[in-house]
Amino acid sequence: MNIVLLGAPGAAKGTQAQKLVAEYGLAHISTGDLLRAAVKAQSELGIKAKEYMDAGQLVPDQLVIDLVKERLSADDAKAGFILDGFPRNTAQAVTLDFELQNMGLKLDAALLVAVEPEVIVERLSSRRTCKECGYTAPAGTEICPNCSGEMYQRDDDKPETIRKRLDVYENQTSPLIEYYKGHGILKEVNGDRPVDEVFADVKTLLSL
Protein backbone atom coordinates (compact mmCIF):
# COMPACT_ATOMS: atom_id res chain seq x y z
CA MET A 1 0.00 0.00 0.00
CA ASN A 2 1.26 3.47 -0.95
CA ILE A 3 0.11 6.33 1.27
CA VAL A 4 0.48 10.10 1.43
CA LEU A 5 0.25 11.28 5.03
CA LEU A 6 -1.47 14.61 5.70
CA GLY A 7 -1.96 16.52 8.94
CA ALA A 8 -1.07 19.78 10.63
CA PRO A 9 2.12 20.18 12.68
CA GLY A 10 1.38 18.54 16.03
CA ALA A 11 -1.33 16.20 14.72
CA ALA A 12 0.90 13.25 15.71
CA LYS A 13 0.78 11.87 12.19
CA GLY A 14 4.38 10.71 12.60
CA THR A 15 3.28 8.45 15.46
CA GLN A 16 0.70 6.81 13.19
CA ALA A 17 3.34 6.44 10.47
CA GLN A 18 5.66 4.65 12.92
CA LYS A 19 2.90 2.23 13.88
CA LEU A 20 2.12 1.47 10.23
CA VAL A 21 5.82 0.88 9.57
CA ALA A 22 6.15 -1.45 12.58
CA GLU A 23 3.03 -3.48 11.81
CA TYR A 24 3.07 -3.65 8.00
CA GLY A 25 6.70 -3.09 6.98
CA LEU A 26 5.98 0.03 4.94
CA ALA A 27 8.85 2.41 4.20
CA HIS A 28 8.43 5.76 6.00
CA ILE A 29 9.71 8.41 3.60
CA SER A 30 10.05 11.81 5.25
CA THR A 31 11.18 14.43 2.74
CA GLY A 32 12.81 16.42 5.55
CA ASP A 33 14.89 13.38 6.51
CA LEU A 34 15.71 12.70 2.85
CA LEU A 35 17.02 16.24 2.37
CA ARG A 36 19.12 16.15 5.54
CA ALA A 37 20.56 12.73 4.66
CA ALA A 38 21.38 13.79 1.08
CA VAL A 39 23.12 16.95 2.29
CA LYS A 40 25.08 14.98 4.90
CA ALA A 41 26.11 12.35 2.34
CA GLN A 42 27.10 15.11 -0.11
CA SER A 43 25.35 13.28 -2.92
CA GLU A 44 24.78 15.09 -6.21
CA LEU A 45 21.18 15.88 -5.22
CA GLY A 46 22.29 16.79 -1.70
CA ILE A 47 24.84 19.31 -2.95
CA LYS A 48 22.19 20.94 -5.14
CA ALA A 49 19.69 21.02 -2.27
CA LYS A 50 22.25 22.55 0.10
CA GLU A 51 22.78 25.50 -2.26
CA TYR A 52 19.09 26.41 -1.97
CA MET A 53 18.94 25.74 1.77
CA ASP A 54 22.04 27.84 2.47
CA ALA A 55 20.49 30.69 0.48
CA GLY A 56 17.33 30.45 2.59
CA GLN A 57 15.30 29.34 -0.43
CA LEU A 58 12.81 26.51 -0.80
CA VAL A 59 14.26 23.42 -2.45
CA PRO A 60 12.61 23.15 -5.92
CA ASP A 61 9.83 20.59 -6.29
CA GLN A 62 11.63 18.60 -8.97
CA LEU A 63 14.70 18.16 -6.77
CA VAL A 64 12.54 16.84 -3.93
CA ILE A 65 10.72 14.54 -6.38
CA ASP A 66 14.09 13.23 -7.60
CA LEU A 67 15.06 12.44 -4.00
CA VAL A 68 11.74 10.66 -3.46
CA LYS A 69 12.15 8.64 -6.68
CA GLU A 70 15.66 7.62 -5.62
CA ARG A 71 14.33 6.51 -2.22
CA LEU A 72 11.43 4.59 -3.78
CA SER A 73 13.89 2.48 -5.75
CA ALA A 74 15.26 1.02 -2.47
CA ASP A 75 14.28 -2.56 -1.65
CA ASP A 76 12.40 -1.67 1.55
CA ALA A 77 9.94 0.48 -0.42
CA LYS A 78 8.81 -2.41 -2.61
CA ALA A 79 6.20 -3.52 -0.05
CA GLY A 80 4.71 -0.03 0.03
CA PHE A 81 5.50 3.40 1.43
CA ILE A 82 4.24 6.29 3.53
CA LEU A 83 5.16 9.68 2.10
CA ASP A 84 5.42 12.29 4.87
CA GLY A 85 6.00 16.01 4.20
CA PHE A 86 5.36 15.93 0.46
CA PRO A 87 3.33 16.95 -1.45
CA ARG A 88 2.51 20.23 0.29
CA ASN A 89 0.33 21.73 -2.44
CA THR A 90 -1.70 20.72 -5.49
CA ALA A 91 1.05 21.44 -8.02
CA GLN A 92 3.38 19.08 -6.15
CA ALA A 93 0.62 16.45 -5.97
CA VAL A 94 0.11 16.55 -9.75
CA THR A 95 3.87 16.20 -10.33
CA LEU A 96 4.07 13.34 -7.83
CA ASP A 97 1.22 11.45 -9.52
CA PHE A 98 2.90 11.86 -12.91
CA GLU A 99 6.28 10.62 -11.66
CA LEU A 100 4.74 7.68 -9.80
CA GLN A 101 2.85 6.69 -12.95
CA ASN A 102 6.14 6.71 -14.87
CA MET A 103 7.54 4.31 -12.26
CA GLY A 104 4.51 2.02 -12.56
CA LEU A 105 3.25 3.09 -9.13
CA LYS A 106 0.20 4.91 -7.78
CA LEU A 107 -1.13 6.20 -4.48
CA ASP A 108 -3.70 4.03 -2.72
CA ALA A 109 -4.69 6.55 -0.05
CA ALA A 110 -4.17 10.07 1.25
CA LEU A 111 -4.53 9.72 5.02
CA LEU A 112 -5.52 12.93 6.82
CA VAL A 113 -4.99 12.97 10.60
CA ALA A 114 -7.37 15.77 11.62
CA VAL A 115 -7.03 17.62 14.94
CA GLU A 116 -8.69 20.88 16.05
CA PRO A 117 -6.26 23.86 15.92
CA GLU A 118 -6.55 24.78 19.63
CA VAL A 119 -5.82 21.18 20.63
CA ILE A 120 -2.63 21.38 18.56
CA VAL A 121 -1.67 24.71 20.15
CA GLU A 122 -2.07 23.15 23.60
CA ARG A 123 -0.15 20.01 22.57
CA LEU A 124 2.83 21.74 21.02
CA SER A 125 3.16 24.62 23.47
CA SER A 126 3.35 22.14 26.35
CA ARG A 127 6.20 20.07 24.93
CA ARG A 128 9.92 20.41 25.52
CA THR A 129 12.76 19.35 23.21
CA CYS A 130 16.22 18.01 24.07
CA LYS A 131 19.04 20.32 22.94
CA GLU A 132 21.26 17.29 22.27
CA CYS A 133 19.17 14.58 20.60
CA GLY A 134 15.86 16.27 19.69
CA TYR A 135 13.76 13.99 21.93
CA THR A 136 10.41 15.58 22.86
CA ALA A 137 8.67 15.30 26.25
CA PRO A 138 5.91 17.09 28.23
CA ALA A 139 6.50 20.42 29.97
CA GLY A 140 8.17 19.98 33.35
CA THR A 141 10.75 17.56 31.94
CA GLU A 142 14.11 19.22 32.61
CA ILE A 143 16.49 16.35 31.81
CA CYS A 144 16.15 14.28 28.64
CA PRO A 145 15.16 10.67 29.49
CA ASN A 146 16.88 9.55 26.29
CA CYS A 147 20.37 11.10 26.61
CA SER A 148 20.31 13.23 29.81
CA GLY A 149 20.60 16.43 27.76
CA GLU A 150 18.97 19.75 28.69
CA MET A 151 15.33 20.25 27.68
CA TYR A 152 14.02 23.56 26.34
CA GLN A 153 11.01 25.10 24.55
CA ARG A 154 11.66 25.67 20.85
CA ASP A 155 10.69 29.09 19.50
CA ASP A 156 8.29 27.46 17.05
CA ASP A 157 6.53 25.69 19.95
CA LYS A 158 5.31 29.00 21.39
CA PRO A 159 1.52 29.56 21.00
CA GLU A 160 1.68 32.62 18.73
CA THR A 161 4.17 30.90 16.41
CA ILE A 162 2.11 27.71 16.32
CA ARG A 163 -1.02 29.62 15.28
CA LYS A 164 0.90 31.24 12.40
CA ARG A 165 2.20 27.83 11.30
CA LEU A 166 -1.34 26.43 11.38
CA ASP A 167 -2.61 29.32 9.23
CA VAL A 168 0.11 28.61 6.65
CA TYR A 169 -0.71 24.89 6.76
CA GLU A 170 -4.43 25.57 6.28
CA ASN A 171 -3.85 27.85 3.29
CA GLN A 172 -1.47 25.38 1.62
CA THR A 173 -3.24 22.14 2.41
CA SER A 174 -6.97 22.86 1.95
CA PRO A 175 -6.71 22.67 -1.88
CA LEU A 176 -4.55 19.53 -1.54
CA ILE A 177 -7.21 17.83 0.58
CA GLU A 178 -9.81 18.70 -2.07
CA TYR A 179 -7.48 17.31 -4.77
CA TYR A 180 -7.25 13.91 -3.10
CA LYS A 181 -10.96 13.95 -2.24
CA GLY A 182 -11.66 14.52 -5.94
CA HIS A 183 -9.49 11.50 -6.78
CA GLY A 184 -11.48 9.38 -4.34
CA ILE A 185 -8.52 8.39 -2.15
CA LEU A 186 -8.85 10.76 0.84
CA LYS A 187 -9.25 8.96 4.18
CA GLU A 188 -9.82 11.18 7.24
CA VAL A 189 -9.32 10.09 10.84
CA ASN A 190 -9.98 12.06 14.04
CA GLY A 191 -6.54 12.41 15.63
CA ASP A 192 -7.78 14.02 18.86
CA ARG A 193 -7.90 10.69 20.74
CA PRO A 194 -5.51 8.16 22.31
CA VAL A 195 -2.91 6.87 19.83
CA ASP A 196 -4.17 3.27 19.78
CA GLU A 197 -7.78 4.36 19.14
CA VAL A 198 -6.63 6.48 16.21
CA PHE A 199 -4.54 3.61 14.85
CA ALA A 200 -7.47 1.18 15.04
CA ASP A 201 -9.50 3.58 12.87
CA VAL A 202 -6.55 4.07 10.50
CA LYS A 203 -6.38 0.31 9.90
CA THR A 204 -10.13 0.17 9.27
CA LEU A 205 -10.01 3.13 6.86
CA LEU A 206 -7.11 1.60 4.95
CA SER A 207 -8.72 -1.88 5.02
CA LEU A 208 -5.62 -3.35 6.66
Question: What residue spans do the PLM features occupy?
Answer:
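Glycine-rich phosphate-binding loop of ATP-dependent small-molecule kinases
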Residues: 1-208
